[in-house]
């Protein structure tokens, strides 16, 4: 997971370089996605995995929300300090926690006050981090950064849903980069076309394309083979790496108050992931208990009939 975090931090740095060289956000989305499209489709062909699926609606929702998350993340990185932008991009556990609270209320199961308190801490951290740091003309970019976290949360729920449907991970990633490529291409054409890259921009494009693919690869390995709780906590090291690199390379200014807000968001994100997982395990346990009770009742009824 730490290796994945390093690649994702470098990905953010390369995006910042490309934006400074005049490469638009839609262009970045296209280059990033198209490189992934070539890689993932090639691996699918090698492993004899087809693109055909009977769950196309779920793939499309996941892919459009995922592409939206990537696009929003790219925009926020281009217009904010790298560390701040990456922190906002990693607020998805807070939104997933909000979804969980909403489900609990809709099912009349009461509120998980620990989870709710954690969410309040996280969103308070966002306010603390941004209030002394950004200027009024950066409010929109900060809002877009939060939108990235929201879109990631929705996309994540559909990734889990597709996983339960036994959809291969490569197929899920394929449709994400396919939609990302199409959205990036259309957006670029509508916003004036492609920019002829300078040497620095070309290197930045190659850098974020490679780093994003490598980061996604190691991220998948960490969550599929490692400890989920530990991996979930270690993924936040990307904020540390991004902040340090942003200060070192771009001379980003990060106040102590902003650092305090970042810490609040990280603590809240890790805690929200833990409490959300607890709620899901509790739900599975209750479902299993109900099914076992029903089976006992049916066996008892069958014995009485005989």
List where the protein language model places each region.
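Transmembrane alpha-helical segments that form core, pore/gating elements
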Residues: 16, 40, 133-192, 284-306
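C-terminal-most transmembrane helix of multi-pass membrane proteins
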Residues: 107, 236-306
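C-terminal transmembrane-helix exit sites in multi-pass transporters
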Residues: 75-78, 92-116, 240-259
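Cytoplasmic-side transmembrane-helix entry/capping segments in multi-pass membrane proteins
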Residues: 1, 54-64, 110-123, 141-146, ...
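Hydrophobic transmembrane alpha-helices of multi-pass small-molecule transport proteins
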Residues: 99, 111-131, 257-276
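Loop-to-transmembrane-helix transition segments
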Residues: 1-4, 48-74, 140-148, 188, ...
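Transmembrane alpha-helices of multi-pass small-molecule transport proteins
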Residues: 21-68, 96-99, 151-155, 174-191
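Helix-helix packing/entry segments at the starts of transmembrane helices
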Residues: 85-91, 167-179, 216-248
């Amino acid at each position: 997971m730490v290796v994945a975090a390093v690649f994702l931090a470098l990905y953010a740095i390369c995006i910042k370089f490309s934006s400074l060289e005049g490469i638009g956000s839609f262009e970045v989305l296209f280059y990033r996605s198209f490189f992934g499209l070539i890689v993932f489709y090639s691996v699918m062909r090698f492993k004899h995995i087809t693109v055909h699926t009977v769950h196309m609606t779920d793939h499309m929702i996941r892919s459009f929300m995922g592409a939206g998350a990537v696009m929003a993340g790219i925009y926020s990185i281009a217009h904010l300090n790298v560390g701040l932008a990456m922190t906002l991009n990693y607020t998805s556990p807070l939104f997933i926690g909000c979804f969980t609270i909403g489900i609990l209320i809709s099912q009349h199961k009461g509120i998980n006050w620990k989870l709710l308190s954690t969410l309040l801490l996280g969103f308070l951290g966002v306010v603390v981090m941004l209030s002394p740091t950004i200027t009024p003309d950066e409010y929109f970019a900060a809002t877009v950064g939060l939108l990235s976290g929201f879109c990631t949360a929705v996309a994540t729920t559909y990734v889990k849903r597709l996983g339960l449907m036994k959809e291969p991970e490569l197929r899920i990633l394929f449709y994400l980069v396919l939609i990302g490529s199409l959205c990036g291409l259309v957006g670029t054409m509508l916003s004036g076309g492609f920019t002829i890259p300078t040497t620095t921009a070309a290197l930045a494009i190659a850098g974020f394309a490679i780093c994003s693919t490598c980061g996604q690869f190691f991220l998948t390995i960490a969550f599929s083979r490692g400890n989920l709780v530990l991996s979930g906590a270690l993924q936040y090291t990307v904020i540390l790496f991004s902040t340090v690199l942003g200060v070192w390379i771009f001379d980003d200014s990060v106040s102590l108050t902003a650092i305090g807000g970042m810490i609040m968001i990280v603590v809240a994100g890790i805690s929200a992931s833990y409490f959300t997982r607890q709620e899901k395990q509790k739900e599975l346990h209750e479902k299993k208990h109900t099914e076992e009770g029903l089976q006992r009742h049916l066996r008892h009824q069958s014995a009485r009939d005989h």
